[in-house]
């Protein structure tokens, strides 16, 4: 299955807010759908930088960089966005977008080891040039830690039973082996959902430190935004969306002064203004069922107080 960019027009339009020039970042290039649309809306003086750590995404991005001199790809995690931009002399930008979903090719190519639907080596690394593979990680992790990860990152109620079965199985080499163990250990299957869905999600998040990276990325993104610059982020499950929601809420709410024994006063430390929260339309969900769980949250950088 080829990759279909989710909330494509909504993301780019919310990012630009009617602008046609400036400096922008796609923090998760993927297969470049959002970046290409963004470039098509910008004038010849604009610049677009993109981040990715997936080797196949980097190949696609390198080809785009050859086609369009306004575009530059950076091989790095978006968790390093501020440092990497400063290294190339970019201190501030007009907009940053991120699509936190795993791309369809990653899910669908058996050799990448993400899929419980197709048998392949148990890998699950976004950047398969470094780090532990899923099979190596499962051998090293303690049963209690694994159960907690499956519960927290997969929101799986039978996490302890599943973790016990995985650890008792010993070395696993393929996604089919892991999926079968989870399937057998799972006492109650959800309608229209493979019983291994939540466990695979949890292991993938843990191996790639996905939630950690999001928590590091968001404040750096705001640091880089110019006043009126936009942050547009697409999430695909409640854990991601909760992080983004809480971050935007915190950055757009007046803080309480400690008061030091005096009556508390509100201190204006706000850096963001909420713009919108958007779901995929019925038409998009029909055309691309993977968009069903997607949420787009958009916020705008406020003017610096006292600047």
Curated annotation (Swiss-Prot):
Which is one Pfam family of this protein? Methyltransf_5
GO CC, sorted alphabetically, is:
cytoplasm
Annotated residues that bind S-adenosyl-L-methionine are located at 32-34, 52, 78, 99, 106
* Record InterPro entries: RsmH, SAM-dep_MeTrfase_MraW_recog, SAM-dependent_MTases_sf
Protein family per UniProt: Belongs to the methyltransferase superfamily. RsmH family.
Q: Which organism is it from?
A: Acinetobacter baumannii (strain AB0057)
GO terms for biological process? rRNA base methylation
Q: What is the protein named?
A: Ribosomal RNA small subunit methyltransferase H
Q: Which GO terms describe its molecular function?
A: rRNA (cytosine-N4-)-methyltransferase activity
EC number(s) of the enzyme? 2.1.1.199
Q: Which PANTHER family match?
A: 12S RRNA N4-METHYLCYTIDINE METHYLTRANSFERASE, S-ADENOSYL-METHYLTRANSFERASE MRAW
Q: What does the record give as the function of this protein?
A: Specifically methylates the N4 position of cytidine in position 1402 (C1402) of 16S rRNA.
Q: Does the keyword Phosphoprotein apply?
A: no
Keyword terms of this UniProt record: Cytoplasm, Methyltransferase, rRNA processing, S-adenosyl-L-methionine, Transferase
Please name the top-level EC class of this enzyme.
Answer: transferase
The signal peptide, as residue positions, is none
Q: Where in the cell is it found?
A: Cytoplasm
Which reactions appear under catalytic activity for this entry? Answer: cytidine(1402) in 16S rRNA + S-adenosyl-L-methionine = N(4)-methylcytidine(1402) in 16S rRNA + S-adenosyl-L-homocysteine + H(+)
SUPFAM superfamilies named in the record:
Putative methyltransferase TM0872, insert domain (SSF81799), S-adenosyl-L-methionine-dependent methyltransferases (SSF53335)
């Amino acid at each position: 299955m080829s990759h279909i960019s989710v909330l494509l027009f909504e993301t780019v339009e919310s990012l630009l807010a009617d602008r046609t020039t400036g400096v922008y970042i796609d923090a998760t290039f993927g297969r470049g759908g959002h970046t290409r649309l963004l470039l098509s809306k910008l004038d010849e003086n604009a610049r677009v930088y993109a981040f990715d750590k997936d080797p196949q995404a980097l190949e696609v991005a390198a080809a785009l960089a050859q086609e369009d001199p306004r575009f530059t790809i950076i091989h790095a995690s978006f968790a390093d966005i501020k440092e990497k931009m400063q290294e190339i002399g970019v201190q501030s930008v007009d907009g940053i977008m991120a699509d936190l979903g795993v791309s369809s090719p990653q899910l669908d190519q058996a050799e990448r080891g993400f899929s419980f639907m197709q048998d392949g080596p148990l890998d699950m690394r976004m950047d398969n040039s470094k780090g532990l593979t899923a099979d190596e990680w499962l051998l090293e992790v303690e049963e209690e830690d694994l159960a907690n990860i499956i519960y927290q990152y997969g929101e799986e109620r039978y996490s302890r039973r599943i973790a016990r079965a995985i650890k008792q199985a010993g070395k696993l080499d393929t996604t089919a082996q892991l999926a079968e163990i989870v399937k057998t250990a799972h006492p109650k299957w959800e309608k229209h959902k493979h019983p291994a869905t939540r466990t695979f999600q949890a292991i993938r998040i843990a191996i790639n430190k996905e939630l950690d990276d999001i928590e590091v990325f968001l404040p750096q993104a705001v640091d880089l935004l110019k006043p009126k610059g936009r942050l547009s982020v697409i999430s695909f499950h409640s854990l991601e969306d909760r992080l983004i929601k809480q971050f935007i809420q915190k950055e757009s709410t007046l803080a309480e002064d400690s008061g030091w024994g005096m009556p508390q006063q509100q201190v204006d430390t706000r850096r963001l203004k909420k713009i919108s929260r958007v779901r995929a339309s019925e038409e998009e969900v029909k055309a691309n069922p993977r968009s069903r769980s997607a949420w787009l949250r958009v916020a705008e950088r406020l003017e610096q107080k006292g600047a």
